Structure formats: structure tokens, C-alpha cells
Amino acid sequence: MSYIEVIDEVKKYQMGDTEIIANDHINFSIEQGEVAVILGPSGAGKSTVLNILGGMDSCDSGQIIIDGVDIANYNAHELTTYRRNDVGFVFQFYNLVPNLTAKENVELASQIVEEALDPEEVLLQVGLGRRMNNFPAQLSGGEQQRVTIA
């Protein structure tokens, strides 16, 4: 069994009288440690499937198996716990608190995570050891993205 398995996943949105099928019986698997790319034209359902994998949306049918557990059947409380404890999700447009340093931004996020890692250590791991006391405006876009990852 793969680490991530999406099996026959369907997601539909209702826009007035129009039904939009964002994901139509999608199937794929990703092994643990494997790098995967989700590629497609605008409106192909890439963000939808990522939102479902990240626990921010749910599918209408199918299975979303992460490490042997089908999260497609999770209720709202279980999805919240999953988002907090089991998945990391970095958006294309991320938000850092502008008047907090990189380290303080990571410390803020670590307050809501069980067994959070040491903020200084994770900033070192993403190559920001010398920049942890800088404010977001003093960091490049890539450095800001790494703060978000940390």
C-alpha cells in the first residue's frame, strides 16, 4: 500500500443550477518520500485535490488514504486534528505576521501544534539560521516561503 492513495475521488460544486465536476474519479498513489507533481491546466482540479489531501475540503465520494487511514470519512473535528497534527500545507500566497521576526512567526505557529519542533532548529534546517531575527520585509520571497515551511 502506498503512503498516499487517492481512489476514485469525486468532488462536485453546485453553482446555482450548474454542477461543476472539479475531480472526476481521480486515482493516484504516492510512496513515502517520493516527490510528486500535480500538473494540469487552469480549472483542472489541482487545488481541489490538494485541499482535500490537506484536510481543508472533503470529497463527495471515493477514498483518500493517508498512511493507511481513510480521511474521506473524517468528521469536522477529526479533520481539524488532522490539519493540526498530521499535515503541513504551504500556500502559494502565504501570510507572515509583518511585525514579528522569522523566529517569532515560527514560535507563534508552534503554539497550536502538539509536539512542535524547536523554532530555532527548524529555521536552521531550512537555511535561515542567520536570518531568524529578521522581519518578513527584510527577507526575500524565497526566505519568507522557508519561514512558512518551518
Residue ranges and their predicted role:
Residues 2-150:
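ABC family nucleotide-binding domain
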